[in-house]
Amino acid sequence: MTHPNELPLSPLSALQFYATAPYPCSYLDGRIARSQVATPSHLINSDVYTDLVKAGFRRSGVFTYRPYCDGCRACVPVRVPVDQFEPNRTQRRVWKKHGELIATVAPLHYDEEHYALYMRYQSARHAGGGMDRDSRDQYEQFLLQSRINSRLVEFREPLRDQADAPGILRMISMIDILGDGLSSVYTFFEPGLPNTSFGTYNIYWQIEQARSLKLPYVYLGYWIRESPKMAYKANFRPLEGLIDGAWCVLDPTSVDLPPVDLAIHGKRPPLKP
């Protein structure tokens, strides 16, 4: 059990932090990962979770964690400062392209249409990774269980024909509402349409939603320089990262991080016990 001294004493002092056993890294092939888990989950309300996110934690269902890998700091928590965000030409084009999508914000709930879209997305984007075989229970545990202020956002095309009512579903996004921003939990979308850039549109939408709520940040989870799947996050500028316990503006092309190869030497992570 560890109590990271970079975390404030209250209200996080009631939590305990445990390191998991090593497991295969889901981001970098051939790597071994570990996580640090915050428990008990019933004490992690929205205020506590806001502080945890500031310290680099994320959640999967009611499981709250952050990377705790031996000698590797490849996973960088990142966020976009809303008032400073400047969309590039590609992002503006995507925003205009999908401007007709209708977003509906709702409490977390199960819907068979959502689950079917999730399975199509996993089969197309992550075939063989395990999530393409998720049962309904696994889907609900992953995305629909939360003890904090969470929302499900539907993105549909405008209703053009009664046969398509209530409009063709294109994307689902789960977000958490924090004290200082929105946290992007997970997004999945229709995978069979070419050149849609739904993911880019979704982040842009979250930034504009945070702006309308007068929230200063959108937290995007972890960015990994060596992972092509994470590259899109670096396109949102300015991008801030949590480096050595402090949030600072990142230059994704030259951010000073230890090489991931340090992991093979068994060095301890840069976290104090």
From Swiss-Prot:
<dbReference type="InterPro" id="IPR030700">
    <property type="entry name" value="N-end_Aminoacyl_Trfase"/>
</dbReference>
<dbReference type="InterPro" id="IPR007472">
    <property type="entry name" value="N-end_Aminoacyl_Trfase_C"/>
</dbReference>
<dbReference type="InterPro" id="IPR007471">
    <property type="entry name" value="N-end_Aminoacyl_Trfase_N"/>
</dbReference>
<protein>
    <recommendedName>
        <fullName>Aspartate/glutamate leucyltransferase</fullName>
        <ecNumber>2.3.2.29</ecNumber>
    </recommendedName>
</protein>
<dbReference type="Pfam" id="PF04377">
    <property type="entry name" value="ATE_C"/>
</dbReference>
<dbReference type="GO" id="GO:0004057">
    <property type="term" value="F:arginyl-tRNA--protein transferase activity"/>
</dbReference>
<dbReference type="InterPro" id="IPR016181">
    <property type="entry name" value="Acyl_CoA_acyltransferase"/>
</dbReference>
<comment type="function">
    <text>Functions in the N-end rule pathway of protein degradation where it conjugates Leu from its aminoacyl-tRNA to the N-termini of proteins containing an N-terminal aspartate or glutamate.</text>
</comment>
<dbReference type="GO" id="GO:0005737">
    <property type="term" value="C:cytoplasm"/>
</dbReference>
<comment type="similarity">
    <text>Belongs to the R-transferase family. Bpt subfamily.</text>
</comment>
<dbReference type="InterPro" id="IPR017138">
    <property type="entry name" value="Asp_Glu_LeuTrfase"/>
</dbReference>
<dbReference type="Pfam" id="PF04376">
    <property type="entry name" value="ATE_N"/>
</dbReference>
<dbReference type="GO" id="GO:0071596">
    <property type="term" value="P:ubiquitin-dependent protein catabolic process via the N-end rule pathway"/>
</dbReference>
<keyword id="KW-0963">Cytoplasm</keyword>
<keyword id="KW-0012">Acyltransferase</keyword>
<dbReference type="GO" id="GO:0008914">
    <property type="term" value="F:leucyl-tRNA--protein transferase activity"/>
</dbReference>
<keyword id="KW-0808">Transferase</keyword>
